Amino acid sequence: MSAEYYFNLGNAYYRSGKKGKAILCYERALRLNPRYEKAQANLDFVNMKIIDRPEPEENILAVGFRNVQNAMSPTAWTVVAMAAFLLSIAGMAAYAFASAITLRKVGFFGGLGLLVVCVFANVFAARANNAATSHDYAVVMNDSTQLSAVSREPLNKDEVAFTLHEGAKLKKNDSIRIDGNVKNTWYKVQTADNREAWIKASAIEEI
């Protein structure tokens, strides 16, 4: 499926009142194409309409790092890393073998700088690839669901951790299948504000 397919499907779901499905589709579109501005704009819009609104990210450094990471695909970052590495070797070779002082200085500092570029490009490539292929995140599909403090249905109010609503995005950290029954799978999840609890698999859908 393409990012455009999920974008259009998300629009259709939103028009039919299914905000959770719409958010899921926009998230999938952005996983395939992190630079899809229309999908990001629509996701931000629908997120403003749900009960459990995600808080805006305030860490400027983290936002900038992610924006640079999303500037290119994992493949493109890998090409940049390889090119920077080869050029850094050429720079070091110039430093080692050139007779002119100026050329040696350019080779040394240029090679060192390109080596730093190589390291960062590899980091961006790995992170971008992980973002595109991982299945660690999910969206709540139920209108309302109680999360449990234990890895099963809460038996009393003391075992209810908190309640989430349709459209909330979660990170899956662990899972357990009770009695080997796939229909009784529970995920340990983390919310955007770092709360942790258990939720039944049937209440969420994987991005």
Regions found by a protein language model. Give the residues of each.
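Membrane-embedded alpha-helical segments of integral membrane proteins
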Residues: 52, 57-97
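Boundary regions of SH3-family modules and the immediately adjacent low-complexity/disordered segments
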Residues: 19, 105-145, 152-159, 171-173, ...
